[in-house]
Swiss-Prot record:
GO terms for biological process: isopentenyl diphosphate biosynthetic process, methylerythritol 4-phosphate pathway involved in terpenoid biosynthetic process. NADPH binds at residues 10-13, 36-38, 122, 124, 203. It comes from the Bacteria. It is an enzyme of class 1 (oxidoreductase). Its cofactor is Mg(2+); Mn(2+). It holds the Pfam family DXPR_C. This is 1-deoxy-D-xylulose 5-phosphate reductoisomerase. It comes from Bacillus pumilus (strain SAFR-032). Pathway: Isoprenoid biosynthesis; isopentenyl diphosphate biosynthesis via DXP pathway; isopentenyl diphosphate from 1-deoxy-D-xylulose 5-phosphate: step 1/6. Catalyzes the NADPH-dependent rearrangement and reduction of 1-deoxy-D-xylulose-5-phosphate (DXP) to 2-C-methyl-D-erythritol 4-phosphate (MEP). Gene3D superfamilies: 1.10.1740.10, NAD(P)-binding Rossmann-like Domain (3.40.50.720). 1-deoxy-D-xylulose 5-phosphate binds at residues 123, 149-150, 174, 197, 210, 215-216, 219. Its EC number is 1.1.1.267.
Length: 383
């Protein structure tokens, strides 16, 4: 039995993680969970899974929870510290970090200090502070197990292989909601159109990131840290069907690929059961004859400028990826609220990157300060 702490239980990854836990009551038990402010979603989860600890970001949600009559005694906390409390909860073996945004960084570090196995779905943890997280993981001898389908695919392809034999990583990308549109057609696109992803069921922020290809850019930075591979050896390949989740090419030009129908529960479950596997009854088998053909296209950095920003930020390193991430979070939020157009997301990010003076080897405090400065700068443009 593995005891789970789930950070971000009411989000897309959180809900699919709960589905995996639900299908394997003999293997997993939810001991702790956190959520933001969606108390209507949280209460049924608490009642079904009966975690010992529940944390929420919103004080209002916390008071609603406190006023609810549960059939058992549950510990509760509110605010930013709640994620940390859940991450270091004593009875937990595995922490699933399904938080969205840079808020996921500190809970990850605290969980590593307590030698919890990390199942990482929060890209921003490695994007903003990859050098610190990797050093923590090495110091405390804690595995970082990827939950993203692309990184899980690479992780699976590398089982039994030696890192020294890797030629390059090939990270696949669906192309997002606007993959069939020319760049000139993007100016007037709506939020509703952007949120209509052709392949995956995801949260709003990551769906917009997929449309701009920033999501893939963040995944490139994440892959750099997870697998210790230079950016020059990480390629992005457009693949509309999302059947090949990623590939690894070795020095002898052999290529290993991991395939499957688009279902986030598969990589989530693999992270929870690793190094074993378990049946996933509701997952669909891959019948290639039904698909007929798979399509591929080279990523166009002029078409997807956010992908270019991510590669350049990663190569520069230091605090630049933290700026990239903070500016993107602010810009995407502004787009979702109707304050900027789709293409203005790129413009805001570029302005933030161009004004930043990089700190080469930042401390955690430096990263926090740069994050806040960047958000304040973008906000000053928006107001």
């Amino acid at each position: 039995m593995r005891y789970i702490s789930l950070l971000g239980a009411t989000g897309s990854i959180g809900e699919q993680t709960l589905d995996v836990i639900r299908q394997h009551p003999d293997k997993f038990k939810l001991k702790a969970m956190t959520f933001g402010r969606n108390v209507d979603k949280a209460i049924p989860i608490i009642e079904q899974f009966q975690p010992e600890f529940v944390g929420c970001l919103s004080e209002e949600a916390y008071h609603t929870l406190k006023g609810h009559s549960f059939e058992y005694d549950v510990k509760m906390a509110a605010g930013d510290e709640a994620n940390i409390e859940a991450a270091i909860y004593d009875a937990v073996d595995v922490v699933v970090n399904a938080l969205v945004g840079s808020v996921g960084l500190v809970p990850t570090l605290k969980a590593i200090e307590q030698k919890k196995t990390i199942a990482l779905a929060n890209k921003e943890t490695l994007v903003t502070a990859g050098h610190i997280v990797k050093e923590y993981a090495k110091t405390y001898d804690v595995p970082l197990l990827p939950v993203d389908s692309e990184h899980s695919a690479i992780f699976q392809c590398l089982q039994g292989e030696q890192a020294k034999n890797i030629e390059r990583l090939i990270v696949t990308a669906s192309g997002g909601s606007f993959r069939d549109k020319k760049r000139t057609e993007l100016e007037g696109v709506t939020v509703e159109e952007a949120l209509n992803h052709p392949n995956w069921s995801m949260g709003a922020k990551i769906t917009i990131d997929s449309a701009t290809m920033m999501n893939k850019g963040l995944e490139v930075i994440e892959a750099h840290w997870l697998f210790d591979i230079p950016y020059e050896q990480i390629d992005v390949l457009l693949h509309k069907e999302s059947i090949i989740h990623s590939m690894v090419e070795f020095h002898d030009k052999s290529v290993m690929a991991q395939l499957g129908t688009p279902d986030m529960r598969v990589p989530i479950q693999y992270a929870l059961t690793y190094p074993d596997r378990a049946p996933l009854p509701e997952a669909k088998s891959l019948n290639l004859w039904e698909i007929g053909q798979l399509n591929f296209q080279k990523a166009d950095f002029d078409r997807y400028r956010c992908l270019h920003f991510a590669y350049e930020s990663g190569k520069i390193g230091g605090t630049m990826p933290a700026v990239l991430n903070a500016a993107n979070e602010m810009a995407v939020d502004a787009f979702l609220k109707g304050k900027v157009t789709f293409l203005q997301i790129e413009e805001l990010i570029e302005k933030a990157l161009n004004r930043h003076h990089v700190i080469s080897t930042p401390s955690l405090q430096d990263i926090h300060e740069v994050d806040k400065e960047t958000r304040d700068f973008v906000q000053s443009i928006l107001t």
